[in-house]
């Protein structure tokens, strides 16, 4: 199982830690999507920035 993560809000006015989490996930701009494996580390980063992203579960790695 994998997670498709899409950034839906910008980073202006957000905390530096949230910007770092988005960058670590590979997100750079609004409506940019990445697919990441469903691991506890990725889930933790997703939880921290859940107000800036949309997450979908997809089949595959």
From Swiss-Prot:
It comes from the Bacteria. The keyword Ribonucleoprotein applies. GO terms for cellular component: cytosolic large ribosomal subunit. GO terms for molecular function: structural constituent of ribosome. InterPro entries: Ribo_uL30_ferredoxin-like_sf, Ribosomal_uL30_bac-type, Ribosomal_uL30_ferredoxin-like. The keyword Ribosomal protein applies. Pfam families: Ribosomal_L30. Keywords: Ribonucleoprotein, Ribosomal protein. GO terms for biological process: translation. CDD domains: Ribosomal_L30 (cd01658). Belongs to the universal ribosomal protein uL30 family. Part of the 50S ribosomal subunit. This is Large ribosomal subunit protein uL30. It comes from Corynebacterium efficiens (strain DSM 44549 / YS-314 / AJ 12310 / JCM 11189 / NBRC 100395).
């Amino acid at each position: 199982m994998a997670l498709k993560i899409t950034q839906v809000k910008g980073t202006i006015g957000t905390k530096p830690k949230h910007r770092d989490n988005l960058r670590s996930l590979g997100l750079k701009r609004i409506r940019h999507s990445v697919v990441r494996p469903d691991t506890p580390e990725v889930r933790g980063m997703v939880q921290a920035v859940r107000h800036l992203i949309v997450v979908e579960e997809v089949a595959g790695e």
